[in-house]
Amino acid sequence: MFLRAIGRPLLAKVKQTTGIVGLDVVPNARAVLIDLYSKTLKEIQAVPEDEGYRKAVESFTRQRLNVCKEEEDWEMIEKRLGCGQVEELIEEARDELTLIGKMIEWDPWGVPDDYECEVIENDAPIPKHVPQHRPGPLPEQFYKTLEGLIAESKTEIPAATPSDPQLKE
C-alpha cells in the first residue's frame, strides 16, 4: 500500500522512451543541457560581438540555460521551452556547438569590405520540363498604393509604373 501511494508519483517522472526511433532517454538531461549551454556560451565568445549569429546564439542559449536552472523537472523544461523533448534539445545543443566550431573555422565575418564576388552567368537553355518559378506581374493596386505613398511623402522618388521593365520581371 505504501509503495503504491508514494512510488507511483515518483515513477511517473521517469521517462520510459522518447517515442523517437534512435533517440534514447537521457536520465540526467537537465544536467547535460546546463553543461552544453554553458559550453556554448563560452565557445561563442570567439565570434565577434557585433555579428548577428553570435547575438542570436547567445540570446536563445541564455534563455534556455535560465529555464534549465530554474526548473528541476524535465517535463517543466520541455513545457516552458516548447521546443520538443529534452533529448531533442540535447541534440540541438550538440549540433550548435559543432556549428560554432565550423563558423569559427570558416570565418564568414572576416570578408574584407572591398571583396568582390565573381558572378558566373549560365546562358544554357532551361529544359521545358524544369519549372522556372518566375513571379507573375504585380497587381495594379500595388502601383496605386505605391504612387499614393510617394505623393504623401513628397520626395523625389520617381513614380513606378507597370510599364517599367524592372518591375515586371
Swiss-Prot record:
Transit peptide stretch: 1-11
Keywords, ordered alphabetically: Electron transport, Membrane, Mitochondrion, Mitochondrion inner membrane, Respiratory chain, Transit peptide, Transport
InterPro entries per record: NDUFA5 (IPR006806)
Main subcellular location: mitochondrion
GO CC annotations, alphabetized: mitochondrial inner membrane; mitochondrial membrane; mitochondrion; plastid; respiratory chain complex I
GO biological process: photorespiration; respiratory electron transport chain
Membrane topology: Peripheral membrane protein
Compartmental location: Mitochondrion inner membrane
PANTHER family per record: NADH DEHYDROGENASE [UBIQUINONE] 1 ALPHA SUBCOMPLEX SUBUNIT 5, NADH-UBIQUINONE OXIDOREDUCTASE 13 KD-B SUBUNIT
Cited function: Accessory subunit of the mitochondrial membrane respiratory chain NADH dehydrogenase (Complex I), that is believed not to be involved in catalysis. Complex I functions in the transfer of electrons from NADH to the respiratory chain. The immediate electron acceptor for the enzyme is believed to be ubiquinone.
Family assignment from sequence similarity: Belongs to the complex I NDUFA5 subunit family.
Complexes and interactors: Complex I is composed of at least 49 different subunits.
Record-given protein name: Probable NADH dehydrogenase [ubiquinone] 1 alpha subcomplex subunit 5, mitochondrial
Organism classification: Eukaryota, Viridiplantae, Streptophyta, Embryophyta, Tracheophyta
